[in-house]
C-alpha cells in the first residue's frame, strides 16, 4: 500500500507506507481483513499526521517496534492508546571495549560562537548550529581526526545535522584520496549501497537513527551538537566482539564556549548515556591534556541540631 498502489487481494502479508495510510482515503474494508498490524519505528506515530494511520488500521492484534519508545514531547501515550503499553523490552547489551573521546573545542571567533537570540531572549539553536557547522577551523579538526583513523584502517562514519556541512567535508576527503560517500535522505538505493562500501561515510543523524545497517563501521564522529545519540552510536556496535579488528570508538566534539550553554547540557546528557553503558570516557582538554572521566559523587551534608538554651 503506497500512494495510488493498493495491492492487497490474495496477499497474506502486505507492506504499507504509514505516510500513505495516514493521508490517503483508502476503502475502509481494505484494513478490515488484517488480523495483525505491525508498526515499525512506532515512536513516529505520536506525530499529528502519522497517528491517523492507527485510527484506520484497527486489527485484533497490534504490535509496535521501537528502540526509542519514549518521546521527548511525552506523546508516546498517543500510540500506546492504540497499540497498548510496553510488554517486552530487551536488556541493554553490554558492549565491552567501547571508548569515547570527548574533545573540547573552543574559539572566540564571532562567526563561530555568536549567541543568536530570539525576541524573547532565548537561544535560536538552528542558527547557532549553522554557525558551528560553517566554521572551517572546527570542521578541519573533524577532517584531521577522520584522516587519522582512516589511515589506521578504521571504518568511519561522520554524522552532522547539516547537509552542506557534509558536502564540504566530502569534497575535502575526496581531494585527499580518502574513499568517501554520502548517506543522506533522498538518495537512490543504489547510491546508498555504493556509499556503504566506502571507508568513510558521511550521513545525517536522521538517516543514522533508522534503517542503517553497516556492520563494518567501528568509528563514529559526532560532528554537530546533538542531545540524543543512542541510535546513532548503535551503528558502530554491529560487529561481533570475537571477529572485530578494532574496538568501537566514539569521537564526541564538545563545544565549550560560554555562549553554548544549551550545547553544554546536551554534552552532559551524552556523557550520562556513555557512563550508563559503561563506556571508557577520555576527556581531551583544550590545553592538550587527556584524562579519564570520573564522576565526582556529591557528599551529603550532615544535619545540624540547634539547641536553644
Can you say where each PLM-predicted feature lies in the sequence?
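Short, conserved loop/helix-junction motifs that constitute active-site signature segments
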Residues: 27-34, 53-59, 215, 236-245
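Structural recognition of the conserved hydrophobic beta-strand(s) that form the central parallel beta-sheet
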Residues: 14-17, 60-67, 201-203
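Conserved RecA-like P-loop NTPase helicase motor core
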Residues: 68, 181, 185-277
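Conserved helix/coil segment N-terminal to the catalytic DExD/H
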Residues: 3-36, 47-52, 207
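Post-DEXD/H (motif II) to motif III coupling segment of the RecA-like Helicase ATP-binding lobe
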Residues: 35-36, 43-103, 274
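Conserved helicase ATPase core of P-loop NTP-dependent helicases/translocases
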Residues: 1-11, 26, 157, 166-212
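A conserved SF2-helicase RecA2
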Residues: 77-102, 109-118, 230, 238-308
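Conserved interdomain hinge at the start of the Helicase C-terminal
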Residues: 120-161, 168-172
Amino acid at each position: 500500500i503506497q500512494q495510488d498502489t493498493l495491492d492487497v487481494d490474495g496477499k497474506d502479508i502486505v507492506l504499507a507506507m504509514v505516510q500513505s495510510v495516514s493521508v490517503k482515503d483508502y476503502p475502509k474494508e481494505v484494513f478490515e481483513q488484517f488480523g495483525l498490524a505491525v508498526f515499525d519505528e512506532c515512536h513516529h506515530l505520536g506525530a499529528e499526521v502519522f497517528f491517523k494511520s492507527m485510527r484506520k488500521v484497527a486489527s485484533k492484534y497490534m504490535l509496535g517496534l521501537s528502540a526509542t519508545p519514549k518521546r521527548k514531547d511525552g506523546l508516546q501515550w498517543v500510540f500506546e492508546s492504540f497499540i497498548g503499553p510496553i510488554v517486552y523490552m530487551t536488556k541493554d547489551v553490554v558492549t565491552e571495549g567501547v571508548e569515547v573521546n570527548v574533545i573540547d573545542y573552543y574559539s572566540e571567533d564571532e562567526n563561530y560562537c555568536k549567541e543568536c537570540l530570539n525576541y524573547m531572549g532565548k537561544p535560536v539553536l538552528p542558527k547557532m548550529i549553522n554557525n558551528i557547522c560553517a566554521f572551517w577551523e572546527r570542521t578541519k579538526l573533524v577532517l584531521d581526526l577522520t584522516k587519522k583513523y582512516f589511515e589506521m584502517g578504521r571504518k568511519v562514519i561522520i554524522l552532522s545535522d547539516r547537509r552542506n556541512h557534509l558536502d564540504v567535508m566530502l569534497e575535502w576527503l575526496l581531494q585527499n584520496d580518502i574513499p568517501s560517500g554520502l548517506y543522506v535522505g533522498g538518495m537512490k538505493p543504489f547510491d546508498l549501497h555504493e556509499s556503504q562500501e566506502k571507508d568513510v561515510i558521511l550521513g545525517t543523524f536522521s538517516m543514522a537513527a533508522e534503517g542503517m545497517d553497516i556492520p563494518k563501521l567501528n568509528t563514529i564522529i559526532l560532528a554537530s551538537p546533538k542531545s540524543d545519540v543512542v541510535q546513532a552510536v548503535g551503528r558502530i556496535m554491529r560487529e561481533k566482539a570475537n571477529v572485530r579488528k578494532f574496538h568501537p570508538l566514539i569521537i564526541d566534539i564538545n563545544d565549550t564556549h560560554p555562549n553554548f550553554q544549551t550545547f553544554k547540557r546536551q554534552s552532559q546528557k551524552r556523557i550520562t548515556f556513555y557512563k550508563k553503558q559503561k563506556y571508557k570516557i577520555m576527556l581531551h582538554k583544550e590545553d592538550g591534556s587527556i584524562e579519564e572521566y570520573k564522576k565526582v559523587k556529591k557528599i551529603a551534608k550532615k544535619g545540624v541540631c540547634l539547641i536553644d538554651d
